[in-house]
Amino acid sequence: MSDSITNPENSEIQTNYDKIVHKFDELKLKEVLLRGIYGYGFVDPSAIQQRAILPIIEGHDVLAQAQSGTGKTGTFSIAALQRIDESIKAPQALILAPTRELALQIQKVVMALALHMDVKVHACIGGTDPREDAEALRAGAQIVVGTPGRVFDMIERRNFKTDHIKMFILDEADEMLSSGFKEQIYKIFTMLPPTTQVVLLSATMPKEVLDVTDKFMNKPVRILVKKDALTLEGIQQYYINVESEEYKYDCLSDLYDSISVTQAVIFCNTRRKVEELTKRLTDDSFTVSAIYSDLPQAQRDTIMKEFRTGSSRILISTDLLARGIDVQQVSLVINYDLPNNKENYIHRIGRGGRFGRKGVAINLVTDRDVGDMRELERFYSTQIEELPANIADLFD
């Protein structure tokens, strides 16, 4: 089950660190951790794991450019579990993620890998009772996975003692730093021991990310996927020119009449559009779930569970879902709207082809969107083809 379909070839990776590890056994990991890795279904390290786990274990600051589906969660989870001192019952590794869903996903992976270890992993996220966080932190959680707002709050209230923190890992750093978390993240940096190792993972390297590396990282090992390697392999990308906004729904209906798809994710740019589309599809007898950031956490969890178990066939979402949620049976992603943020395109279409599955991404494009689509093609060095007439063949 290695999450490595988008492994770039070694020639497509630029790095200032020359050690490559081809087998997990070569990393000299704790025996109990190795059992967890193989038990989880990892066989061999993905390209990013071959290069990034070792420098993290060695204590270097690491800046890794990797998008969803490359095995990056396994990379920092394995390294953190190797570095943790199980006898110290206090937070030693702090992992930040931009959304609650991604934080919970990471927590699940860390706990699965730590199955045979005496390690407590706590998710410190908004939408839950802060008293539960305080209790879990007091009870000796050694790895804390959280969202910036809640983590900052817990540290500020002195419920989260940072004296033993040795690793600070920022996942999806580009998303966090562009989503208004920058100030909180900077403050968290200042509340950690000065010797804390910093590991930063990001699909793209905008100025905000590079500023953090300059300010808070010490001679980082850089593992950067070349720009033109950022398109997800295994995803066939198409567009339909719908001319104008009012024709999008009819186009979507026609699409569903033409193809047989087990499950699909449809992305819209606003909550209002998610709600409108959900209502129209439901009125037309489709089984639909909708998810967006304002929903209470319990409701979001229920919706994701329904979709994962297959009781809902269509999930309509804002970009909340675009990062890090593993829904393995999804073969089709539809961008009802092109994303406002170019970086989110890769996360959206990456839903469809994780874990070696092929996926199809279809973009509904108005005449006004054509320029933005061409810009996406340039940005990712890719081609988005017009959807062919024999579209049913794509889903055989």
UniProtKB/Swiss-Prot annotation:
Function (record text): ATP-dependent RNA helicase which is a subunit of the eIF4F complex involved in cap recognition and is required for mRNA binding to ribosome. In the current model of translation initiation, eIF4A unwinds RNA secondary structures in the 5'-UTR of mRNAs which is necessary to allow efficient binding of the small ribosomal subunit, and subsequent scanning for the initiator codon.
Protein name: ATP-dependent RNA helicase eIF4A
GO CC entries: cytoplasmic stress granule
Species whose genome carries this gene: Eremothecium gossypii (strain ATCC 10895 / CBS 109.51 / FGSC 9923 / NRRL Y-1056) (Yeast)
Annotated domain remarks: The Q motif is unique to and characteristic of the DEAD box family of RNA helicases and controls ATP binding and hydrolysis.
Organism lineage: Eukaryota, Fungi, Dikarya, Ascomycota, Saccharomycotina
Subcellular location: Cytoplasm
SUPFAM superfamilies, per database record: P-loop containing nucleoside triphosphate hydrolases (SSF52540)
Span of the annotated motif DEAD box: 171-174
CDD domains associated with the record: DEADc_EIF4AII_EIF4AI_DDX2 (cd18046), SF2_C_DEAD (cd18787)
Residues the record lists as binding ATP: A66, Q67, S68, G69, T70, G71, K72, T73
